[in-house]
């Protein structure tokens, strides 16, 4: 497999590309997979936990915010595991630093086999400039009202694992290796097959803070009437 490094932002009507990644990361270059029809994507079920001490507080009353707390720490890395991870329109998925500990990277995986439909807001609270990674091998769709409110860079991937600089892996499937999660930074996105799931951005500008980056790493990337940008 070939390693690719680069930084590219895309805009326009309908753009289809095999892989996008920010300069701070590396990704495995892959054979593209055709994008499934996402025009009628549903946002059910929303967010559930699948281990690693991930806690999710469901909205109550008039609230539309899911607070994601706890998780499993290794140094300044914070790991979360979700059975499903989708954000309905007008809802907020809020990664909340309930411990107050210094955090460099928030790494989340989705294990349930359903795509992540991000139609609301992804947010981090109390993490400063921590980077956010979300890995779902089943696919990721950003709807027309999707938004990011994250202090650091963000990476969305349909990879099967994240490889860290010390050689450790954070796998999309739970297993005994979870006992050896690492404090090292993310070095690469790893795929076990030649047909990774696609990522779609539908009619929305996904923006991050000035000086930060957006990485979309997986199969075909389709940007329909939207842009990827920072706020410079």
Named regions from a protein language model:
Residues 4-5, 26-232:
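Solvent-exposed adhesion/ligand-recognition segments of exported proteins
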Residues 1-17:
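N-terminal secretory signal peptides that target proteins for export/translocation
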Residues 19-21, 27:
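Cysteine-centered motifs
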